[in-house]
Regions:
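Short structural boundary motif marking the start of a folded domain
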Residues: 2-7
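C-terminal structural segment of proteins
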Residues: 8, 53, 57-58, 90, ...
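Structural motif
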Residues: 10-12, 71, 268
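Short, contiguous acidic and Ser/Thr-rich linear segments
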Residues: 12-21
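Short, structural beta-strand-to-alpha-helix junction motif
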Residues: 21-26, 51, 65, 233, ...
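A basic, amphipathic helix-loop patch mediating RNA/tRNA/ribosome contacts
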Residues: 22-54
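Short cysteine clusters
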Residues: 42, 47-50, 62, 97-100, ...
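S4-like RNA-binding module at protein N-termini
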Residues: 53-77
Length: 436
């Protein structure tokens, strides 16, 4: 295994000592390469001012670790030359105060390159609104009138893994198992771990990056379930999950911005154990399970049994999430998923809920209502006797807390109203409201 990280920076091959793998990409770009077009705004992956493009997808360089670039191609605003996104921004007078403009340009560049989703989705992760926003949208529409002015450049990069005491990036499951030990910190996309650097000023050590492990990047569609590898990102899993039910696709579209979804992983969201993680309620409601592995030993755990307390899980030392199994809905089953937050895009949920009824069997799961995402067994049992009895039972299942996002009363009232909405909806398809 190598002791260097290799990637392309604006088509130039770059080798960096693996010891620097735990630095943020933004810090390395500005301090080591003097590429200061990429700006720091929020330092937590929310505002998009630091957007760069990795393999045609936008990422937030403020929380993206340098080591994650191994084997990839990085483009910064300095590498665009005269791209249609830049030309359209100039012609439409899309520059605001200027500080966030490079981030907007890079988000538009990524949208131009991959042409996935809507323009509004592409810009949802860029939050600067200091002056006229309409010209930026106009630029996003106009740039497609122009042809590319540059061609992609590719260079053969090393195919083996990276290993250093501070940072490792294995390429195979065998390499990963050789590196795992109880003190290792497993890294998926870094959308949460990166905050420990930028906000808590931690110096990470013994980090093992999972994103290059081939076996963890598999996504298989079986007749009765999906099997999603532990390193599959939200962006990669979105289409398959959206086919299970439209509500899941709509909910995932609101999980962070495009920059977060491009590198954040479903398994990372699960392992993080946040009580307000957006993916867990719908996965629990569907009856999902986790394949856990340590060495040659494997076991399967239902996701609803995975959490043992606030940000505590059933993972044992040296164990990792190999894959997530997501059952498909049976014919005739009713399902809905809801996300309630103050802001429609790029916001943390106050309440996240999923309701699944198949015949006489009900599975209700909620986030933001307890120390962990959890089922509502009393409400499930009461639902057959009427929605009002089920709503009353929710108050027995959960005793939510008050915080800066919502009061306990608000959370419980919203959860009850969402259950009423599910019961009354003819199609049982959720309408993802901004307000309750």
């Amino acid at each position: 295994m190598r002791s260097t990280i290799e990637f392309l920076l604006n088509s130039e091959r770059v080798c960096v000592p693996a010891a620097q793998g735990t630095r943020t990409l933004l810090a390395w770009l500005r301090e080591e390469r003097r590429l200061t077009g990429t700006k720091e705004g929020c330092a937590e992956g929310d505002c998009g001012a630091c957007t760069v493009v990795v393999d045609s997808l936008p990422v937030c360089s403020c929380i993206y670790l340098l080591g994650c670039l191994d084997g990839k191609s990085l483009t910064t605003v300095e590498g665009l030359k005269e791209h249609p996104a830049q030309r359209a921004m100039v012609e439409c007078h899309g520059s605001q105060c200027g500080f966030c403009t490079p981030g907007f340009v890079m988000a538009l560049y990524a949208h131009y390159q991959n042409r996935q989703g809507t323009l509004c989705d592409a810009l949802a992760g860029n939050l600067c609104r200091c002056t006229g926003y309409a010209p930026i949208l106009a630029a996003g529409e106009k740039m497609f009138q122009y042809e590319k002015t540059q061609s992609s450049s590719f260079s053969q990069l090393a195919q083996d893994g990276v290993h250093h005491r501070r940072f490792s990036a294995p390429r195979t499951l065998a390499e990963l198992q050789a590196l795992l030990h109880p003190g290792a910190t497993l890294l998926g996309g870094g959308t949460d771990l990166g905050l420990s650097i930028t906000k808590q000023l931690r110096e990470l050590d013994n980090v093992v990056y999972l994103g290059n492990v081939a076996e963890l990047r598999e996504l298989d569609d079986f007749p009765d379930h999906l099997r999603i590898g532990g390193a599959v990102t939200y962006t990669e899993a979105h289409a398959a999950l959206a086919r299970l039910h439209p509500d899941i696709g709509e909910l995932l579209r609101r999980l962070g911005g495009a920059q977060v979804r491009a590198c954040g992983t479903l398994a990372g969201n699960i392992a993080n154990g946040s009580p307000i993680g957006d993916s867990m309620p719908f996965l629990i409601a569907l009856g999902s399970s986790l394949e856990l592995q340590s060495g040659s030993r494997q076991r399967t755990v239902l996701l609803e049994n995975f959490y043992t307390g606030y940000r505590k899980t059933a993972l044992q030392p040296g164990e990792f999430i190999r894959a997530i199994r997501v059952p498909k809905l049976a014919s005739g089953a009713r399902f809905a998923a809801y996300k309630i937050s103050k802001r429609f895009d790029q916001d943390i949920s106050a309440v996240c809920a999923a309701f699944h009824v198949d015949g006489k069997n009900a599975r209700f799961a909620l986030g933001g209502m307890a120390a962990t995402p959890a089922r509502a067994p009393r409400a499930e049992a009461a639902f057959a006797h009427g929605v009002e009895k089920a709503c009353a039972a929710l108050a027995e299942d959960f005793k939510p807390l008050s915080d800066h996002r919502a009061s306990a009363w608000y959370r419980l009232t919203v959860a009850q109203n969402l259950l009423r909405k599910f019961s009354e909806a003819k199609s049982a398809r959720a309408i993802l409201d901004l307000q309750p």
